[in-house]
Amino acid sequence: MIGKLKGTIDEIGEDYVLVDVQGVCYVAYCSARTLSKLGSAGEACVLFIETYVREDQLKLFGFMTALEREWFNLLQSVQGVGAKVALAVLSTLTPGELANAIALQDRAAVSRAPGVGPKVAMRLVTELKNRAPAYAGEAINIALKRELGEGVAAAPVADAVSALTNLGYSRDQAANAVAAAMKTAGEGADSAKLIRLGLKELAR
């Protein structure tokens, strides 16, 4: 099994990169986000690889980080999500944004990915709620998860985060602001109050 490729970029296509490793070229299918972070032909390239072996084909999927690869596999554990849809989700959301969307039960954020309809979005946020990669950093917004806790009604929180992102803030900024707002407002606060308090946090 191939776990990582280190070589030079030979060609970048619409959904793949051709990596030259000592004269042998490998095709690795990637998310649009990963492809956008790669350099140009002739530049060095390092990709974490997930190898798919089927009876009639062998495919390599490439990722900038091991975390992105972990999310790729986790997404496919949900019914209706294959490699194509998993890459579409990772093209639309960063690992951190995806973790926040799941913690917030924010189906709308997940539904922005091509190929993800309402039913699949519901399954993603529901089934993966307690299965996100269990380490901090970009993938997990610790403050937000602490404020939500288990069993907290997430709809007002998701609405507040969505409203703040519509105002131009990043999803991580919005999530942090709403998490701070929940400390002040408490679990029973409606979305309007969370938005007001969140804006105050962002204005500081």
Curated annotation (Swiss-Prot):
<keyword id="KW-0963">Cytoplasm</keyword>
<dbReference type="InterPro" id="IPR011114">
    <property type="entry name" value="RuvA_C"/>
</dbReference>
<dbReference type="GO" id="GO:0009378">
    <property type="term" value="F:four-way junction helicase activity"/>
</dbReference>
<dbReference type="InterPro" id="IPR010994">
    <property type="entry name" value="RuvA_2-like"/>
</dbReference>
<feature type="region of interest" description="Domain III">
    <location>
        <begin position="152"/>
        <end position="204"/>
    </location>
</feature>
<dbReference type="InterPro" id="IPR013849">
    <property type="entry name" value="DNA_helicase_Holl-junc_RuvA_I"/>
</dbReference>
<protein>
    <recommendedName>
        <fullName>Holliday junction branch migration complex subunit RuvA</fullName>
    </recommendedName>
</protein>
<dbReference type="GO" id="GO:0006310">
    <property type="term" value="P:DNA recombination"/>
</dbReference>
<comment type="similarity">
    <text>Belongs to the RuvA family.</text>
</comment>
<dbReference type="InterPro" id="IPR000085">
    <property type="entry name" value="RuvA"/>
</dbReference>
<feature type="region of interest" description="Domain I">
    <location>
        <begin position="1"/>
        <end position="64"/>
    </location>
</feature>
<comment type="function">
    <text>The RuvA-RuvB-RuvC complex processes Holliday junction (HJ) DNA during genetic recombination and DNA repair, while the RuvA-RuvB complex plays an important role in the rescue of blocked DNA replication forks via replication fork reversal (RFR). RuvA specifically binds to HJ cruciform DNA, conferring on it an open structure. The RuvB hexamer acts as an ATP-dependent pump, pulling dsDNA into and through the RuvAB complex. HJ branch migration allows RuvC to scan DNA until it finds its consensus sequence, where it cleaves and resolves the cruciform DNA.</text>
</comment>
<comment type="subunit">
    <text>Homotetramer. Forms an RuvA(8)-RuvB(12)-Holliday junction (HJ) complex. HJ DNA is sandwiched between 2 RuvA tetramers; dsDNA enters through RuvA and exits via RuvB. An RuvB hexamer assembles on each DNA strand where it exits the tetramer. Each RuvB hexamer is contacted by two RuvA subunits (via domain III) on 2 adjacent RuvB subunits; this complex drives branch migration. In the full resolvosome a probable DNA-RuvA(4)-RuvB(12)-RuvC(2) complex forms which resolves the HJ.</text>
</comment>
<dbReference type="GO" id="GO:0005737">
    <property type="term" value="C:cytoplasm"/>
</dbReference>
<feature type="region of interest" description="Flexible linker">
    <location>
        <begin position="144"/>
        <end position="151"/>
    </location>
</feature>
<dbReference type="GO" id="GO:0048476">
    <property type="term" value="C:Holliday junction resolvase complex"/>
</dbReference>
<keyword id="KW-0227">DNA damage</keyword>
<dbReference type="Pfam" id="PF01330">
    <property type="entry name" value="RuvA_N"/>
</dbReference>
<dbReference type="InterPro" id="IPR036267">
    <property type="entry name" value="RuvA_C_sf"/>
</dbReference>
<dbReference type="GO" id="GO:0006281">
    <property type="term" value="P:DNA repair"/>
</dbReference>
<dbReference type="Pfam" id="PF14520">
    <property type="entry name" value="HHH_5"/>
</dbReference>
<dbReference type="GO" id="GO:0005524">
    <property type="term" value="F:ATP binding"/>
</dbReference>
<feature type="region of interest" description="Domain II">
    <location>
        <begin position="65"/>
        <end position="143"/>
    </location>
</feature>
<keyword id="KW-0238">DNA-binding</keyword>
<dbReference type="GO" id="GO:0009379">
    <property type="term" value="C:Holliday junction helicase complex"/>
</dbReference>
<dbReference type="InterPro" id="IPR012340">
    <property type="entry name" value="NA-bd_OB-fold"/>
</dbReference>
<keyword id="KW-0233">DNA recombination</keyword>
<dbReference type="GO" id="GO:0000400">
    <property type="term" value="F:four-way junction DNA binding"/>
</dbReference>
<keyword id="KW-0234">DNA repair</keyword>
<dbReference type="Pfam" id="PF07499">
    <property type="entry name" value="RuvA_C"/>
</dbReference>
